From Swiss-Prot:
Source organism of this protein record: Granulibacter bethesdensis (strain ATCC BAA-1260 / CGDNIH1)
Keyword entries, A-Z: Ribonucleoprotein, Ribosomal protein, RNA-binding, rRNA-binding
Gene that encodes it: rpsC
Gene Ontology cellular component annotations, sorted alphabetically: cytosolic small ribosomal subunit
Keyword RNA-binding: yes
Domain of life: Bacteria
Swiss-Prot/TrEMBL GO biological process terms: translation
A GO term, aspect molecular function: mRNA binding
Function of the protein: Binds the lower part of the 30S subunit head. Binds mRNA in the 70S ribosome, positioning it for translation.
Name under which the protein is recorded: Small ribosomal subunit protein uS3
Family: Belongs to the universal ribosomal protein uS3 family.
The KH type-2 domain, residue ranges: 38-106
Length: 225
């Protein structure tokens, strides 16, 4: 049987870059675990901010964390109080000063991770899965996506037998390496058990002469303090 490889991992070094950007020889495993702890802490603290990506860079031993969020105001807080508390918490975990940047996601409707999390939250609130999927597809296509595919799996609607339902509009060329495909997964914890949500969003093709070929998403958004 065929299986779908993660489209982001397949395109690393082609039109996507890594979310952890640093080099370490013998210290690799410790820094990797530090990254996992920092990401877990941020996702837990900022669950209401619509966090899509957390990019961690370590130039000259000082970590630099960039948070891509749909609601940066929730991260920053009143007069910057929340972001300062967050920075102190990360500094305590990392054992060294941490530089923190917030980048606003201007179109959360075409961010695969945020779309998947939104559908998962609707499933937890007992919204009909077909309605949630169709609404997400319509919003994404309206805001400029060239194609979108959504998979929902599990005991959908409380059914006795788990199944997979999917909905697609436009084209999603998973085999085309120059295609800019965003991918996100989320889990809905319902009273009947867990339901998985997968989202693929095709945003267009990145050509060799495109100056944003390294990472279109990073070039679209300018960091803000």
């Amino acid at each position: 049987m065929g299986h779908k490889v993660n489209p982001i991992g397949l395109r690393l070094g082609i039109n996507r870059t890594w979310d952890s950007r640093w080099y370490a020889g013998g210290d690799y495993s410790r820094l990797l675990h530090d990254d996992l702890k920092l990401r877990g802490h941020l996702r837990k603290k900022l669950s209401g901010a619509g966090v899509s990506r957390v990019v961690i860079e370590r130039p000259a031993k000082k970590p630099r964390v960039t948070i891509y969020a749909a609601r940066p105001g929730v991260v920053i807080g009143k007069k910057g109080q929340d972001i300062e508390a967050l920075r102190k918490g990360l500094t305590g975990m990392a054992g060294t000063d941490v530089a923190l940047n917030i980048v606003e996601i201007r179109k959360p409707e075409i961010d695969a991770t945020l779309v998947a999390e939104n559908i998962a939250q609707q499933l937890e609130r007992r919204v009909a899965f077909r309605r949630a999927m169709k609404r997400a597809v319509q919003s994404a296509m309206r805001l400029g996506a060239q194609g979108i595919r959504i998979n929902c799996s599990g005991r959908l609607g409380g059914a006795e037998i788990a199944r997979i339902e999917w909905y697609r509009e436009g084209r999603v060329p998973l085999h085309t390496l120059r295609a800019d495909i965003d991918y996100g997964v989320a889990t809905a914890k319902t009273t009947y058990g867990t339901c998985g949500v997968k989202v693929w969003i095709f945003k267009g093709e990145i050509l060799a002469q495109d100056p944003m070929a390294q990472d279109r998403r990073a070039a679209e958004q300018a960091p803000q303090r």
